[in-house]
Structures are given as C-alpha cells and as structure tokens.
Amino acid sequence: MVDIDAEVVEECKKHLPEMHQGAFEDPRTRVLNEDARGYLEKTSERFDLIVVDLVEPLEEGPACLLFTKEFYGLIRDRLTDQGVMTMQAGMTKINELHFYGAVSRTLREVFPVVAPYQGFVSCFGTPWGFMLASKGTDPRRQSAEEIDRLIAARLNPDELGYWNGGAHLHSFNLPKFLSQAVERNDRVITDANPLIVS
C-alpha cells in the first residue's frame, strides 16, 4: 500500500478496525508512505491488482496529477498481462457526471478494456462510480455463477457483506443516463490539462 499521508494511515489503523479487519498485520502487507506516482515511476515491480483510492482532484490538491493519461500509463506499465486496476471515480448522480465521464474517457486512451461500474456507498448517501481497466480482462464477461465460484475458491463468501455474483452483474449494468455520460464525454485529462473538481 502506498499512501502519502502516514498520519492518516496510523489513524485508520487505530480507529477503523472494522474496515481494515487486520490487513495491516498480514505479513504480505507493506505500507510505503510516499507519493504513489513517484513510487510507480521508480519501481520495476509488476502487480496483478492496483487499487487507486484517492480524494477527488481539488484545486492545488495532491491528487490532480493522479487522474491523468500519463499516470494511467504508469499504472498500465506496472500491471501484469492479466492484471487489473480499479479506482473510485466520483459520484454518479444524474447532474454530476462530468468527472466520471472524463475519467472513463481518459482511461480509454490508455487501456484496451475499461469497465465503468457503480455501487451505493452508504457513508456518502449516494451511488458512487468506479472504473476497472485492464490489458485484456473484462469483468463484464463473467456470469454470476462464475463470480460466486471464484469468491468461494478464495475466501468464505459469508464474510463478504456486499459482493456476490448478482451484485457483480448489477454493478456493471449501468443505467442509460450513466452509459450516455460515459459514451458522450470527450474530455481527456492530461498532466498539461488536469481536471479540477470544484
């Protein structure tokens, strides 16, 4: 895990045990307190999964250059051939879709497979948008039964409070207004022309 803010990570360890469920004590976990982009630029490691969970790109904020075509290119180059990246991409309220559409459009400049999805995030009180991007793996081609089998092979399905085969299919089946926002957006976010959310 790469996070620029060591203090926030420590506070999460202390105060959010129900969220991390001991993941920080897992011997496979390494926490690096540094800039994620800088880390990807210098590492030669390859990853099966990269999860990008950022604050939105606010003016003068640290995340502005972590939503760009160039950053997504770094992620692509650090994924294994079957690797995937997933990220949060803002709320999916009907009149708040420019950011979601621009992230999708930018990812399509870099990855051959981009699968937008959404889920309800109770602490935000609204549906929230996410993206999955890869060099070839497409989660929309998996049946509910296949997803349930994959989950059961890796962990106890009863420990998951949300995801199963049905939720998987539902999340990737976007309502018409959301599909249109993704298809019609032509904004490509770059280092030279970052998107700022106000």
Residue ranges and their predicted role:
Residues 21-25, 53-55, 72-75, 107-110, ...:
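Short, surface-exposed linear patches
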Residues 1-84, 94-100:
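The AdoMet/dcAdoMet-binding core of the Class I SAM-like
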Residues 9-12, 108-113, 150-152:
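A short linear-motif detector with a strong N-terminal bias
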Residues 19, 23-26, 58, 86, ...:
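A near-ubiquitous, low-amplitude feature marking generic local secondary-structure context
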Residues 42, 61-142:
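C-terminal substrate-binding/active-site "lid" region of AdoMet-derived donor-dependent transferases
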Residues 25, 48, 102, 131-133, ...:
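General N-terminal targeting signals
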Residues 116-198:
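Soluble small-group transferase modules, centered on the S-adenosyl donor enzyme superfamily
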